[in-house]
A protein has these predicted regions:
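N-terminal secretory signal peptides that target proteins for export/translocation
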Residues: 1-8
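Intrinsically disordered, low-complexity terminal tails/loops enriched in metal-binding residues
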Residues: 4, 21-211
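Bacterial N-terminal signal peptides
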Residues: 9-22
Length: 211
């Protein structure tokens, strides 16, 4: 097929390549943004309308308004350092493993806390953290399985938090992990709804007696 040159001297093939590059570059790696506040203003997400969702360096970040996006991107290293500290603070108490997810060694006082793809990983050393960075999908799957195994026994919601359908009476729920916690759903499609507003559904886990 012949390539046709358009304005600015770009061929159809070149344009297609650029579009594909942008699409791939905008893909989220890892989990949704797990915090309920804007990383710049500190305001509760949703307090100024629908949050602005951006993928920056492969990670999803949510902001209270578009004005905060530029401030975050002025120094992404410092901005992510602040976000990571909050993720460690919120996810560490419920972290499901007492061994390094890579080596299997017992985690001690010198364990390394690393946030990759908006998830906390605890390793015995910095070298193991590098292994996770090299293959995040593999280790997220392992971490998700550990979360499910730990939280399944104490999971208190009797209904799908999205549809409201009962999960009792022999129903086999779909089990997913979002923001480091187990959700039991009536179907896989409901996961997308939780990812739209993870803070809302995490609150349901904190007060299961009302749901």
């Amino acid at each position: 097929m012949k390539e046709h040159t358009h304005a600015f001297g770009l061929t159809v093939g070149t344009l297609f390549t650029l579009v594909m590059f942008v699409a791939v570059g905008a893909d989220r790696v890892g989990d949704v943004y797990p915090l309920d506040t804007c990383p710049i203003s500190g305001k509760k997400l949703g307090s100024m309308g629908d949050p602005v969702v951006k993928v920056i360096d492969g990670r999803e970040v949510r902001f209270c308004c578009s004005g905060c996006v530029g401030k975050f991107e002025q120094n992404t290293e410092a901005s992510f350092k602040s976000v990571d500290a909050k993720i460690v603070e919120t996810q560490k108490p419920s972290y499901p493993l007492d061994v390094c997810i890579n080596s299997g060694e017992k985690l001690g006082k010198d364990a390394v806390d690393t946030v990759i793809g908006n998830r906390l990983y605890r390793t015995c050393c910095a070298d193991c953290a590098k292994e996770i960075r090299a293959n995040p999908g593999k280790f997220q799957e392992k971490l998700d399985k550990a979360v499910i195994e730990k939280e399944r026994a104490t999971y208190a919601l009797k209904k799908c938090p999205v549809s409201g359908e009962s999960l009792e009476g022999g129903v086999k729920p779909t089990e997913v992990v979002v923001a480091g916690h187990l959700f039991r759903l009536c179907c896989a499609d409901c996961k997308a709804e939780i990812e739209k507003n993870p803070a809302k559904y995490l609150d349901l886990l904190k007060s299961p007696q009302t749901h």
